[in-house]
C-alpha cells in the first residue's frame, strides 16, 4: 500500500471526531477554530445595480498594460474599474444590439461565464493587440456546433467569442462585432462554461504564452449520465488549451498548440489539455512554481481543488475527490486514491461537514495563490473557498497536502473588529442597502491591479479587496 493510501486508511479508522459514511467519507471535519487566519478587507469597488438587483459579479482581470481592472457581470456586461476602485465604467455590453450576440442568462448557472484579456492586449502592432475573449451561454442554437452535446438533446449553446478593441486604452470598447471561435451544444441546462484564462506568469519566450485555457463543465444533469468527462472525443468535462490567434484547429478559427497532450491522437480531441472534471469554475497559477490549481465542484459528496497538468485525468466521473464515485448519494470508502493514472485533489472537504450545517452548501470556488508580502499571514497560501456559503479556505503552497480536509483552514474577515464570514459581511451590507439579507454568496475570486486578492459575489454588488 502506498504512503498516501496508508495515510487515508489510518484516518478512516483512527479518528473518533466524525462518523464516516458513504455520503460523508472523511472522519475528520474542517477545524472551525484552529489555524484560522483573520484578514482586513476594503470595499474596493461597487458595480451598478442591474434592473434593481445587484450585479452578478463573476470574474476580474487586471491586464498589465492598461492600468485598470476589468470585471464581468454574468448578465453580459464588462466593466472597466480604475486601480483605486473609485471609477467604474461600462466597458462592453454584450446585449447591445449592434453586436447581434445572444446571451442566455436565465437561472443561476447561465449567462456570460468568463472572459480573458490577451497578454498582448496593450502592445501596439502585436497579433493580440486589443483582443479579449468572452465565454457565454446563448439561446441561439441554429448555428452548427463545433462540439456536439454527446446525445440527442440540446438545451442551449455556449460560445467562445473574440473581440478586438481599436484602442485598448479607451474606457469603453471601441471595436466592431465579435468573431466566433467555437460553439458547444449543451445537453443539459447546468454545468456550462467555466473559466477563461491566459497564464499570467509566463513570458513571450515560453510556449505557453498566449495560449487560452477554457474550463468546460461535464454537460450537466447529475452524475455525468453520458460519461462525457472521461470521453476524449467529446468536449465536455475538459480543460481546453488553444491558440486563439491560430488557424490550424478543426474549424480553422483557432490554433492547436503543438505541445498539447493529445495532438496526433485520432481517438482524442487535440484541444484537450486536461480532462475528468465536473464543473471547473475557477483555476489559477502559482507565480513561483507554475502549478495550476483547479477548483472543481463535486456532485453531492466531495468538493475539491487539484493541480492540473498536461494530459492529467482529474478523475470524474470515476472518482469524486479521493473516492470511487458510486452514485449521487454515495462514494466507495474502500481503496481511496488507488488509481495511479488519476490526479487526485490536494485538498478536499465533504458537503456534509458540520461547518456548513444550516447553510447553503456546497460548491468549490476560487482560487488564488498569494505570493505577496503586504499581508504576511497570507504569504505562500493557496486561497479557495465555497461558492454558495462564501467560506474562504487556505492551505500552504510550500507544503502541499495530499487530499482530505485536514489541511483545509478558514479565512475570516475583520468586520468592525469581529472575525466574520463573507456571508455575514454581505448580509450586513444588504441591511445597509435596504435589502433582505442574502442566504448565499455565490463567491468568486479575482486578482487586483497589484496582485491583491479580490472577493466577488452576486448579492450586494461590492467587490472586496483583502488588505494589510
Predicted feature descriptions by range:
Residues 266-306:
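Repeat-solenoid scaffold signature
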Residues 221-234:
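Acidic/polar, solvent-exposed loop segments in beta-strand-rich repeat domains
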Residues 1-3:
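N-terminal secretory signal peptides that target proteins for export/translocation
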Residues 20-223, 282-285, 290-298, 360-399, ...:
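Acidic, Gly/Ser/Thr-rich repeat motifs that build Ca2+-stabilized beta-propeller blades
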Residues 246-248, 308-340:
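Mobile, glycine-enriched helix-loop/loop "lid" segments at the mouths of ligand-binding/catalytic clefts
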Residues 312, 323, 328-331, 342, ...:
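Long, low-charge, small-residue-enriched segments that form tightly packed helices used
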Residues 27-52, 85-106, 162-187, 208, ...:
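Blade-edge beta-strand/turn elements of extracellular beta-propeller
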Residues 6-16:
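Bacterial N-terminal signal peptides
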Amino acid at each position: 500500500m502506498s504512503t498516501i493510501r496508508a495515510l487515508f486508511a489510518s484516518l478512516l479508522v483512527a479518528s473518533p471526531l466524525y462518523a464516516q459514511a458513504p455520503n460523508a467519507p472523511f472522519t475528520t471535519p474542517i477545524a472551525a477554530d484552529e489555524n484560522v487566519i483573520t484578514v482586513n478587507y476594503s470595499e474596493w469597488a461597487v458595480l451598478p445595480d442591474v434592473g434593481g438587483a445587484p450585479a452578478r459579479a463573476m470574474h476580474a482581470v487586471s491586464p498589465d498594460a492598461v492600468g485598470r481592472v476589468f470585471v464581468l457581470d454574468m448578465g453580459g456586461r464588462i466593466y472597466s474599474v480604475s486601480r483605486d476602485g473609485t471609477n467604474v465604467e461600462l466597458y462592453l455590453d454584450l446585449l447591445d444590439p449592434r453586436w447581434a450576440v445572444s446571451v442566455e442568462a436565465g437561472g443561476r448557472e447561465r449567462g456570460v461565464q468568463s472572459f480573458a484579456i490577451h497578454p498582448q492586449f496593450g502592445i501596439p502592432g502585436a497579433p493580440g493587440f486589443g483582443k479579449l475573449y468572452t465565454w457565454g451561454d446563448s439561446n441561439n442554437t441554429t448555428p452548427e456546433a463545433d462540439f456536439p452535446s454527446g446525445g440527442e438533446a440540446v438545451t442551449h449553446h455556449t460560445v467562445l467569442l473574440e473581440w478586438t478593441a481599436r484602442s485598448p486604452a479607451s474606457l469603453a470598447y471601441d471595436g466592431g462585432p465579435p468573431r466566433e471561435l467555437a460553439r458547444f451544444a449543451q445537453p443539459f441546462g447546468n454545468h456550462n462554461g467555466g473559466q477563461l484564462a491566459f497564464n499570467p506568469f509566463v513570458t513571450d519566450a515560453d510556449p505557453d504564452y498566449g495560449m487560452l485555457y477554457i474550463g468546460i463543465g461535464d454537460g450537466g444533469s447529475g452524475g455525468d449520465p453520458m460519461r462525457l468527462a472521461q470521453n476524449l472525443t467529446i468536449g465536455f468535462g475538459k480543460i481546453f488549451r488553444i491558440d486563439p490567434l491560430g488557424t490550424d484547429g478543426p474549424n480553422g478559427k483557432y490554433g492547436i498548440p503543438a505541445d498539447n497532450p493529445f495532438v496526433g491522437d485520432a481517438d482524442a480531441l487535440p484541444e484537450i489539455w486536461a480532462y475528468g472534471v465536473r464543473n471547473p469554475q475557477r483555476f489559477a497559477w502559482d507565480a513561483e512554481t507554475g502549478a495550476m490549481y483547479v477548483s472543481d465542484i463535486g456532485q453531492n459528496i466531495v468538493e475539491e481543488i487539484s493541480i492540473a497538468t498536461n494530459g492529467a485525468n482529474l478523475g470524474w466521473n470515476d472518482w469524486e475527490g479521493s473516492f470511487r464515485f458510486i452514485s449521487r448519494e454515495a462514494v466507495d470508502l474502500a481503496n481511496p486514491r488507488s488509481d495511479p493514472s488519476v490526479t487526485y485533489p490536494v485538498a478536499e472537504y465533504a458537503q456534509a461537514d458540520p461547518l456548513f450545517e444550516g447553510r447553503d452548501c456546497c460548491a468549490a470556488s476560487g482560487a488564488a495563490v498569494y505570493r505577496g508580502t503586504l499581508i504576511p499571514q497570507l504569504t505562500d497560501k493557496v486561497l479557495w473557498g465555497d461558492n454558495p456559503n462564501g467560506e474562504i479556505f487556505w492551505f500552504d503552497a510550500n507544503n502541499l497536502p495530499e487530499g482530505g480536509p485536514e489541511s483545509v483552514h478558514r479565512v475570516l474577515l475583520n468586520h468592525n473588529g469581529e472575525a466574520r464570514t463573507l456571508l455575514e459581511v454581505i448580509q450586513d451590507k444588504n441591511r445597509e442597502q435596504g435589502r433582505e439579507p442574502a442566504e448565499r454568496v455565490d463567491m468568486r475570486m479575482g486578482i487586483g491591479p497589484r496582485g491583491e486578492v479580490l472577493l466577488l459575489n452576486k448579492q450586494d454588488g461590492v467587490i472586496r479587496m483583502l488588505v494589510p
